[in-house]
């Protein structure tokens, strides 16, 4: 198994999924170059019959940011999911007039071809009735998974610290929560509090008996790293007591060669049955200001590259990212 490294340059928050047509789809944050007005302004897709083919596949823009108002700035971390027979994209966006007013939004494809068919806006993600907290503050990085016939969304929201919350949805209306969320994880350990106190970028990996939620922590520079929480698949996932959190990072800069700040990942099984992690990380040359588009503010530096690693499993079936 040999994948290009970087897999796709300048594509942070990479997300790869396999569709019902057997093809693989890739999306990611389209980068900003040095400032907020030079990027983060569209949603892109790639399609290939193989994971490897995504690295050179044509990149299509399927949606552009609005000129003003909601969904006009900071278009971040899109994820494409096939839910109840339809394609959806969850993404975060701010406003030209308030660029940090970040909230999650939803697009729906009107056909079965996400590359060529029309996408329509379903608007901002909606909380359940009586829930006046969800999406009331800076919130982003929404992901979806199904387990035992129930459908869940996980996202990051800054209610104090940036923490992860989870709630259920009706798969026929995945732009609405159907219950109040639980707090899944918040920054607790030193490695989650470097530069910023952050848990974000959730990614779900299911094994035969467990649900693992990997997440990214700390600031988005060299300190960026990944942790995990997990629960039994047969447990009540909406009961916080059923989740366990590891006290050490699952993947960090010291685990990699010539890569720094690994995070905001997704998981996919390739055409040969290999379990992969797709993540972004900067090259160490970035910190020597050799990237060509260096910026002191990590968010506006495009040198976060999409990369791929093989996930291994120990004798108990626990995933290992290192």
Label the model's feature ranges.
Residues 1-322:
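Carbohydrate-active catalytic/glycan-binding domains of CAZyme proteins
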């Amino acid at each position: 198994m040999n994948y290009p490294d970087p897999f796709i340059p300048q594509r942070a928050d990479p997300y790869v999924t396999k569709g019902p047509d057997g093809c693989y789809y890739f999306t990611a944050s389209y980068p900003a170059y040095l400032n907020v007005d030079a990027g983060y302004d569209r949603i892109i897709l790639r399609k290939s019959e193989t994971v490897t083919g995504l690295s050179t596949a044509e990149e299509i823009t399927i949606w552009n940011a609005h000129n003003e108002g909601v969904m006009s700035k900071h278009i971040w971390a899109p994820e494409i999911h096939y839910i109840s027979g339809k394609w959806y994209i969850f993404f975060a966006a701010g406003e030209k007039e308030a660029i940090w007013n970040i909230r999650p939004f939803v697009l729906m494809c009107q056909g079965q071809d996400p590359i060529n068919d029309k996408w329509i806006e379903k608007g901002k993600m909606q909380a359940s009735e009586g829930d006046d907290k969800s999406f009331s503050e800076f919130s982003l990085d929404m992901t979806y998974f199904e387990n035992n016939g129930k459908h869940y969304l996980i996202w990051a929201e800054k209610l104090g610290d940036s923490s992860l919350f989870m709630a259920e949805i009706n798969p026929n209306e995945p732009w609405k929560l159907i219950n109040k969320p639980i707090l899944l994880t918040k920054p607790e350990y030193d490695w989650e509090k470097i530069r910023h106190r952050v848990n974000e970028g959730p990614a779900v990996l299911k094994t035969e008996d467990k649900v693992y939620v990997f997440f990214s922590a700390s600031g988005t520079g060299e300190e960026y790293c990944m942790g995990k929480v997990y629960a039994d698949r047969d447990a009540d996932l909406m009961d916080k007591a059923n989740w366990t959190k590891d006290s050490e990072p699952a993947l960090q800069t010291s685990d990699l060669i010539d890569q720094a700040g690994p995070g905001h990942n997704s998981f996919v099984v390739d055409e040969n049955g290999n379990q992969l992690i797709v993540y972004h990380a900067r090259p160490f040359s970035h910190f020597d200001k050799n990237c060509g588009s260096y910026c002191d503010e990590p968010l506006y530096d495009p040198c976060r590259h999409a990369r791929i690693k093989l996930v291994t499993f120990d004798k108990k079936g626990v995933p290992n990212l290192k």
